[in-house]
Amino acid sequence: VGYLPSSLVPLLLLLFVFQSPQDTLQKHSQAAESQRRAGNAAGAENEYRVVLTEGYGKLGKVYAAEKKYQEAISALESARLYGPESEELLIDLAIAYFDAEQYEKALEPSSKALAAKPQSAGAHQMRGKSYFMLGDFDKAAAELQAALKITPNDNDIAYTLGLAYLKQHQLPPAQQIYGRMLAQLGDRPQLHIVFGRAYRETGFLAEAIEEFKKAVAIDSNFPRAHYYLGLTYLLKDGASRLPDAEHEFKIELNSNPGEFFANYYLGIVYLMDRKWEPAIGFLQKAILIQPANPDPYFHLGQAYQATEKYTEAIEVLRKSVALNPSLGHNDYQVATAHYRLGQSLLKAGQNEAGQKELQIAADLKSKSLQRDKEKNEVYLNAANLQEANRKFPELNSSEGMIAESKSPGAGVAEELRAGEAYYSGMIAKAHNELGLLRADSGDFKMAAEQFALAAKSNSQLEGLNFNWGLAAFKAELYKEATSPLERELSAHPENVQAKELLGLSYFILENYHRTSQLLSDVIAVRQSNVGVYYTLAVSLIKEGNQARANQVIEQMVTIGGNTPQLHILLGQAYNEQGETDKALEELRAAVSLDSKLPMVHYYSGLVYMKVGKFDEATKEFETELLLNPDNVQAQYNLGFVLLAQQKTAAGIKVMGDVIQIKPDFADAYYELGKAQVQKGEIKDGVFNLEMAARLAPDKSYVQYQLGRAYLAAGRKAEGESHLEISRQLKEKERQQTKP
């Protein structure tokens, strides 16, 4: 059975999107839960992946029907990640890219579908429509011919193939196709309207008129039929057909008084006939129907000017200017609108405002002349229609006829919203369960990724934010952990474990103020975890709140007794107060209790570095790295000390290793670049100092060294510029440190 082009039929998507309330997604989800309960994690994961493949595929269909094309693309691309790429999925993706006007990208999935199934009518059709929009009508026709051969009764394909023939100026084969469609579907007015539009938009105006006449002969009251006929009279023969056009527009309005275009164009016909009052009436009616359209305001302004109603002209012309979408709209209508507005203001005695509008009109006219030149060049030289239409939408005509679609009605829209919620919920649940399975296996990074994907579909899923934050924390993704944990606390402020995880994350991120807030709440409820006291005390010391830190240390002593962590903490406290001998004494006490304790040698190295004992600092950092090779800060400080001792080659090597491990370590780039410049390796030094400046643009010392490096490289202007930036940043720093 044949069917009409997509722009003419109601939305049928729901027939296959909502197969039943308990569709296959529920079955696979239940099967996954059964596998998980049986201890078969791999089987459960496979079932959840099926849920994601089907769920994303159906969600993509819903988004496409809602005209949310980018969301549709995202959903359908996600479906490709979790299961086999079915023909249906690939064609749906091609359609989504096509509807989003990404015609080049639409070719990839349709071509892939065709490679897997050469007899895929849908793949041939989407390739044909995409080539059509890209302006390659030969390829478009070839693909559409292949599609029509496979499904000879598909009238959507036939109609588009007819358009491709018309674009190739091949009238007879297009007429033959449209004749077959008439024989198949019956002699209906809507078919003649569609054919007439195709002929009109491809320049076959006489044929278009004949089709519109056939439409009105079958049904004189068919919506827009007389309007299309009247408009095509004007397009073909101009002012000589004004009476005929007027006659057709009046007939249209008798049957469809609320038809915008009939009111609008009848108003224009009366303008051209200098019949001002009826022109004003019809244009006012058009404005009531489409109050956000700038065009009837523009022409109404002309009628008011002609009748010397300048106050009214000023009002509607200002409205036309305000609503105008672009310079190129309606042959630079906005430039003329400013000109007419200027004239009306002058007539109304508003000379200054009038002159201003006339100047704007002159400027826009100049731009329009340049744009005309560019438009001609684009029209002649553009690689495809998409490029031309993107730069100059006013060049677009028949292309829109194969890309247009109608919005769903209210009832369908409500069902689509329900479908969106349903599939999003199923997808979120599947991602959440996959995250839990990955966490159970110890793959916390992948677990965090799955929880993040679940949140995209349903951020309100119970327990999701905590699971995501915990997985990110265990994967050492501390920055990523903070957002879901903050949301968890916002919803459940009583969750002490979330507070502890969030506080520890902020500590690692060096946000000591937030750490102190959170962990103070934690120790008020959980008083037995010495590690939390330790972290809180360090944060308070870093904040400069020594009195409160001492209180926490006393509580820590009461709970934990004489522990190595206590001595490390006391060592840090003494170091912050400048009592370096006492700090080293406490750190040695920690080593005596546990010589392999992480961080104790690192903190000892910092104290030795502070007092200028670089040999001792080097030994401490090296010892720390033997115990804890992943301590990037220890490695950085080792490199710093080596460079300070003029052990340049060794220091450069260590700093290079630091950057390999942590590519966003600004100070490592800074020290490495500075050392390279001093060594005479100017090019490498400039590169690393540029990286430092990119990562830490507000550091005066970085800008200073980069400026000096540019000068050394002979780049005087850049060098002086960065030295000036450094000076400004130093001044800003001084202002901020003033009491």
Where would I find each of the regions flagged by the language model?
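TPR-adjacent "capping" and linker segments in tetratricopeptide-repeat scaffold/adaptor proteins
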Residues: F18-K27, Y48-L52, S326-D331, K375-N381, ...
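Alpha-helical segment of the N-proximal tetratricopeptide repeat
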Residues: T24-V50, E54-A65, L163, R390-P408, ...
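Helix-start (N-cap) detector for alpha-helical repeat units in TPR-like alpha-solenoids
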Residues: L25, T53, E87-E88, A121-G122, ...
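Structural signature of tandem alpha-helical TPR/SEL1-like repeats
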Residues: R37-G43, E66-S78, A100-K112, M133-A146, ...
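Structural marker of alpha-solenoid helical repeat scaffolds
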Residues: E54, Y82, A116, I150, ...
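TPR/TPR-like (Sel1-like) alpha-helical repeat modules
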Residues: R318-A322, A335, Y339-L369, E690, ...
